Amino acid sequence: MSLYPNVLSVSNKYGFINQSEQFEDRNVASDDVRNYKIVHRGDFAYNPARINVGSIAMLKRFNSGIVSPMYICFRINASIVDPSYFELFLQSRAFKDEMEIRLEGSVRRCLSFDAMCEIHIPCPNIIEQCTIAEQIGKISSKIELEESLLTAYANQKDWLLKQMFI
Protein backbone atom coordinates (compact mmCIF):
# COMPACT_ATOMS: atom_id res chain seq x y z
CA MET A 1 0.00 0.00 0.00
CA SER A 2 1.31 3.43 -0.91
CA LEU A 3 1.96 6.14 1.68
CA TYR A 4 0.26 8.47 -0.81
CA PRO A 5 -3.39 7.52 -1.21
CA ASN A 6 -3.92 10.07 -3.98
CA VAL A 7 -2.82 8.58 -7.30
CA LEU A 8 -3.27 11.62 -9.53
CA SER A 9 -3.54 12.51 -13.20
CA VAL A 10 -3.49 15.92 -14.85
CA SER A 11 -6.63 16.68 -16.85
CA ASN A 12 -6.65 19.44 -19.44
CA LYS A 13 -10.05 20.53 -18.10
CA TYR A 14 -9.82 20.05 -14.32
CA GLY A 15 -6.10 20.09 -13.51
CA PHE A 16 -4.96 17.53 -10.93
CA ILE A 17 -7.60 14.87 -10.28
CA ASN A 18 -7.65 11.42 -8.73
CA GLN A 19 -7.06 8.80 -11.42
CA SER A 20 -10.25 7.12 -10.22
CA GLU A 21 -12.17 10.25 -11.34
CA GLN A 22 -10.61 10.29 -14.79
CA PHE A 23 -10.70 6.54 -15.41
CA GLU A 24 -13.85 5.50 -13.52
CA ASP A 25 -14.21 2.10 -15.16
CA ARG A 26 -10.63 0.88 -14.67
CA ASN A 27 -7.58 1.15 -12.49
CA VAL A 28 -4.72 2.48 -14.58
CA ALA A 29 -2.19 2.93 -11.79
CA SER A 30 0.52 0.33 -11.62
CA ASP A 31 0.52 -2.03 -8.64
CA ASP A 32 4.15 -1.03 -8.15
CA VAL A 33 4.24 2.73 -7.54
CA ARG A 34 7.87 2.90 -6.41
CA ASN A 35 8.81 4.85 -9.54
CA TYR A 36 5.89 7.24 -9.25
CA LYS A 37 6.72 10.87 -8.57
CA ILE A 38 5.60 12.63 -5.41
CA VAL A 39 3.88 16.00 -5.83
CA HIS A 40 2.99 18.49 -3.11
CA ARG A 41 0.59 21.42 -3.00
CA GLY A 42 1.95 24.17 -5.25
CA ASP A 43 3.94 21.81 -7.50
CA PHE A 44 3.30 21.77 -11.23
CA ALA A 45 3.14 18.70 -13.45
CA TYR A 46 2.51 18.04 -17.10
CA ASN A 47 2.30 15.17 -19.50
CA PRO A 48 4.94 16.01 -22.12
CA ALA A 49 2.86 14.32 -24.83
CA ARG A 50 -0.39 16.10 -23.89
CA ILE A 51 0.74 19.58 -22.89
CA ASN A 52 -0.34 20.82 -26.34
CA VAL A 53 -3.96 20.19 -25.27
CA GLY A 54 -3.50 21.86 -21.88
CA SER A 55 -2.52 18.95 -19.63
CA ILE A 56 -0.46 21.04 -17.20
CA ALA A 57 -1.54 22.18 -13.75
CA MET A 58 -0.57 23.33 -10.29
CA LEU A 59 -1.58 21.03 -7.43
CA LYS A 60 -4.15 22.91 -5.34
CA ARG A 61 -6.88 20.42 -4.47
CA PHE A 62 -4.73 17.93 -2.52
CA ASN A 63 -1.87 18.36 -0.07
CA SER A 64 0.14 15.68 -1.85
CA GLY A 65 -0.12 12.70 -4.14
CA ILE A 66 1.76 10.64 -6.67
CA VAL A 67 1.76 10.75 -10.45
CA SER A 68 2.94 8.36 -13.13
CA PRO A 69 6.64 8.52 -13.98
CA MET A 70 5.69 9.84 -17.43
CA TYR A 71 4.80 13.24 -15.89
CA ILE A 72 7.32 16.04 -15.66
CA CYS A 73 7.02 17.65 -12.22
CA PHE A 74 8.56 20.89 -11.04
CA ARG A 75 8.27 23.68 -8.51
CA ILE A 76 8.85 27.33 -9.33
CA ASN A 77 10.80 29.81 -7.22
CA ALA A 78 7.92 31.78 -5.69
CA SER A 79 10.20 34.68 -4.73
CA ILE A 80 10.77 35.32 -8.45
CA VAL A 81 7.52 34.15 -10.10
CA ASP A 82 4.18 34.11 -8.30
CA PRO A 83 2.62 30.64 -8.77
CA SER A 84 -0.82 32.09 -9.59
CA TYR A 85 0.74 34.44 -12.14
CA PHE A 86 2.64 31.51 -13.69
CA GLU A 87 -0.59 29.52 -13.81
CA LEU A 88 -2.22 32.38 -15.74
CA PHE A 89 0.77 32.53 -18.09
CA LEU A 90 0.24 28.84 -18.88
CA GLN A 91 -3.26 29.73 -20.13
CA SER A 92 -2.04 32.58 -22.34
CA ARG A 93 -1.67 32.69 -26.10
CA ALA A 94 1.98 33.71 -25.58
CA PHE A 95 2.73 30.45 -23.75
CA LYS A 96 0.86 28.37 -26.33
CA ASP A 97 2.79 30.00 -29.18
CA GLU A 98 6.14 29.51 -27.43
CA MET A 99 5.26 25.90 -26.58
CA GLU A 100 4.21 25.15 -30.17
CA ILE A 101 7.63 26.24 -31.44
CA ARG A 102 9.36 23.88 -29.02
CA LEU A 103 7.26 20.72 -29.42
CA GLU A 104 9.30 17.80 -30.73
CA GLY A 105 8.17 14.78 -32.74
CA SER A 106 5.72 14.28 -35.57
CA VAL A 107 2.81 12.15 -34.35
CA ARG A 108 2.77 12.60 -30.59
CA ARG A 109 4.49 15.92 -30.15
CA CYS A 110 6.24 16.34 -26.80
CA LEU A 111 7.64 19.21 -24.77
CA SER A 112 10.76 18.28 -22.84
CA PHE A 113 11.54 20.01 -19.56
CA ASP A 114 14.61 21.61 -21.14
CA ALA A 115 12.42 23.03 -23.91
CA MET A 116 9.88 24.21 -21.31
CA CYS A 117 12.65 26.06 -19.46
CA GLU A 118 13.54 27.94 -22.65
CA ILE A 119 10.12 29.62 -22.73
CA HIS A 120 10.41 33.28 -21.75
CA ILE A 121 7.99 34.37 -19.03
CA PRO A 122 7.26 38.11 -19.00
CA CYS A 123 7.95 38.94 -15.35
CA PRO A 124 7.10 42.27 -13.82
CA ASN A 125 8.13 42.55 -10.17
CA ILE A 126 6.58 40.05 -7.75
CA ILE A 127 4.16 42.61 -6.26
CA GLU A 128 2.81 43.45 -9.71
CA GLN A 129 2.54 39.73 -10.57
CA CYS A 130 0.46 39.17 -7.42
CA THR A 131 -1.75 42.17 -8.25
CA ILE A 132 -2.31 40.91 -11.80
CA ALA A 133 -3.14 37.40 -10.58
CA GLU A 134 -5.51 38.78 -7.94
CA GLN A 135 -7.35 41.02 -10.43
CA ILE A 136 -7.72 38.25 -13.00
CA GLY A 137 -8.89 35.95 -10.19
CA LYS A 138 -11.63 38.46 -9.31
CA ILE A 139 -12.68 38.65 -12.96
CA SER A 140 -12.75 34.84 -13.19
CA SER A 141 -14.91 34.64 -10.06
CA LYS A 142 -17.29 37.21 -11.53
CA ILE A 143 -17.51 35.21 -14.77
CA GLU A 144 -18.28 32.01 -12.80
CA LEU A 145 -21.01 33.83 -10.87
CA GLU A 146 -22.54 35.25 -14.05
CA GLU A 147 -22.43 31.83 -15.74
CA SER A 148 -24.23 30.24 -12.77
CA LEU A 149 -26.86 33.00 -12.88
CA LEU A 150 -27.29 32.43 -16.61
CA THR A 151 -27.77 28.70 -15.99
CA ALA A 152 -30.33 29.44 -13.26
CA TYR A 153 -32.25 31.79 -15.58
CA ALA A 154 -32.20 29.20 -18.39
CA ASN A 155 -33.53 26.55 -15.98
CA GLN A 156 -36.22 28.94 -14.77
CA LYS A 157 -37.23 29.71 -18.36
CA ASP A 158 -37.43 25.97 -19.18
CA TRP A 159 -39.57 25.36 -16.08
CA LEU A 160 -41.91 28.24 -16.95
CA LEU A 161 -42.30 27.01 -20.53
CA LYS A 162 -43.17 23.53 -19.28
CA GLN A 163 -45.75 24.98 -16.89
CA MET A 164 -47.33 27.07 -19.64
CA PHE A 165 -47.86 24.16 -22.00
CA ILE A 166 -48.92 21.32 -19.69
Where are these regions (language model features)?
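DNA target-recognition domains and sequence-specific DNA-contacting regions of bacterial/archaeal
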Residues: 1-123
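Amphipathic alpha-helical coiled-coil/heptad-repeat segments
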Residues: 122-166
